[in-house]
Amino acid sequence: MKIPNKIRIGGQDINVCIKDRLINEKLGMICLASGELDIAETFYDYKQCESSKGNTFIHEVVHGVLDTMGEKELSSNEKFVNTFASLLVDVIEEIVKANKEK
């Protein structure tokens, strides 16, 4: 999955950055207030592979969508966010694949 440099969530521009490391050794984080979504290149001593970065990107987008909707409780439920994001990744990849075949 190619990760874009910028996305929009609820009319708000969000800049997407790949950084070497994030605070507290997180894989990713989104801050709607600052309009930033960051993805870690390195997690502890391991490089995050491309598919993991793609999954992290969608995971953070799900947080951003839920926060924009005012669904703070759902957004703080990592089990829900992980499951929902992993299901979305599969659908998104199939859509991209179908569009490339045209």
Regions found by a protein language model. Name each.
Residues 94-102:
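Short, Lys/Arg-rich amphipathic alpha-helical interaction segments
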Residues 2-51, 67-68, 72-82, 86, ...:
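Active-site scaffold of zinc-dependent metalloenzymes
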Residues 55-67:
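Active-site recognition of the HExxH zinc-binding catalytic motif
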